[in-house]
Amino acid sequence: MNIKMTKNLIKFSNKNILVTFHPVTLEVDTAKKQFENLLYALDKLKDTQIIFTMPNSDTEGRIIQKLITNYVNKNKFKSIAYTSMGQKRYLSTLKYVDAIVGNSSSGILEAPSFKIVTINIGDRQKNRVQGKTVINCRPEKKQILNALEKVYSKKF
């Protein structure tokens, strides 16, 4: 089955996560393991809709695209993926998500303007100015799980 594209409607849940994860250009052969760790953590979420945007066309981007496709095909009831959401749909979607998860600059730049939590995974956005709504973590299962728990805790 093909991935649902931008014409399909997002079925929002009580909890919603937007995932945008790109390979890190200067890190060779790390994208697959890092993204598998993210998928492991996302799989632990209950009653949560996961909205993926496809990665850019960096060297290991096709690996991540395949992992997303496989995940969505196995988890149709709780996930959807977009090759491109377009600016309007992307910004409109931010209104309904609890967090942006991944390593995209939009989590650092746009999300804080909307007062949306960002889980920034790894070093892709290293040394960028960040708002108070950004949680940084290593691309490791336990750290990602801890960051996701923090998003839904009353402390954050």
Language model segments and positions:
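Nucleotide-activated sugar donor-binding and catalytic core shared by glycosyltransferases
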Residues: 1-156
